[in-house]
């Protein structure tokens, strides 16, 4: 997969703001409940194995975890993944975060997922 290094760097520079509901990611905080509800209306997440591709700081990832899913978040931004890990640890969430490309992860893994976001 081709990744634009400047795009990755842009998100690395602002990744620590993921959980600031009034910061640069404020629109995601507004729509996240809608995204989460849409997904949970389509599939019962309880007990499902979910992968959240391009998870960023983990907003949707954690929402799906709260619905009972076992969630793996993957993102190319190492800073965003670190931010997501720290936030999950603070909340005692058992979420797996992986820094990398989803395509490579899926090619290298024998794990399967019930839901892909």
What spans do the regions from the language model cover?
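N-terminal, positively charged/glycine-rich alpha-helical extensions of SAM-dependent methyltransferases
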Residues: 1-19
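Alpha-helical elements of Rossmann-like donor-binding domains used by nucleotide-donor carbohydrate transfer enzymes
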Residues: 10, 34-38, 83
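Class I SAM-dependent methyltransferase Rossmann-like catalytic core
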Residues: 22-26
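Conserved alpha-helix/loop element of class I SAM-dependent methyltransferases that forms part
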Residues: 29-46
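Structured loop/turn residues at beta-strand edges in well-structured enzyme cores
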Residues: 48, 93, 111
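Conserved class I S-adenosyl-L-methionine
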Residues: 48-54
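Class I SAM-dependent methyltransferase SAM/SAH-binding core
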Residues: 51, 59-104
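A short acidic, Gly/Pro-enriched loop at the edge of an enzyme's catalytic core
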Residues: 107-116
